[in-house]
Amino acid sequence: MRFQLAINLERLDDSRDMNEVARHTLEMVQMAEEGGFTIAWAAEHHALEMTIAPNPLQILTWWASNTDRIRLGTAVAVAAYWHPVNLAGEAAFLDLISGGRLEFGIGSGAYQREFDRMHPGLKQSDAWRHMQEMLPVLKKLWAGDYAHDGEFWSFPTSTSVPKPVQKPHPPIWVAARSPITFDFAVKNGCNILSWPIARPFAEAELYRSQLDASIAAHTGYDTPTWAVMRHTAVYDSADPVSYTHMTLPTNREV
């Protein structure tokens, strides 16, 4: 089992200084690197003080310039909010300047509130279709010239500039909590991120059973790595009386 860190710039309201929020967040990423964590993950969310992450690739660029070894992951880039040419190029540029440390996570998006602002008219429950169109397009753009005429995006012959350092592309992770997405990830050779967060661990066990069913149904594909996010409390003392409560989302990779 390996451990990863998923952390956001967070505050309850604008009474807390953003410089302090940023300092604390970077300190935690640097501590994770020194502690042997394998990946630091940045989210994408919009207009939420509790998850300040308007562009995960910008956040990871910042972390890349202040770390040396830890790998850097998007958890996740929300497909419906991006154009494929834009996302392919930005992700590849991060892979370049980080020395090939990108772990590319893509997903459907979590909150209807955000879709109402970022993609009006799109139901969160339908956004998986954008993700499933987007991912194959990204792979083709990273590989070379490609023209696309799809349900959600169309563009003439284009390519990713630059190309990723990692060949044929960075490791790809798909956010999955349903059988249709587990199936898609397995068939496309992707690793998997699941978010039980703080719910009973039975939810993680349910996701694992769905993943196992997908693996069994699609023989001949590589077995994906599965990372599970759990909110984890970290203390600086074994004495419960002196606990300073701090909860961080931590991924366990199995």
Predicted feature residues:
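Short, conserved secondary-structure transition motifs
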Residues: 230-239
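N-terminal beta1-alpha1-beta2 module of alpha/beta enzyme domains
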Residues: 1-72, 167-170
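Conserved, mostly hydrophobic/aromatic
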Residues: 63, 94, 138, 172, ...
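Hydrophobic faces of well-ordered beta-strands that scaffold small-molecule active sites
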Residues: 3-7, 40-42, 72-74, 102-106, ...
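Conserved small/polar residues in nucleotide/adenosyl-binding loops
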Residues: 244-250
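Flexible, glycine-rich active-site loops centered on histidine and acidic residues
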Residues: 1-18, 80-148, 192-194, 198-202
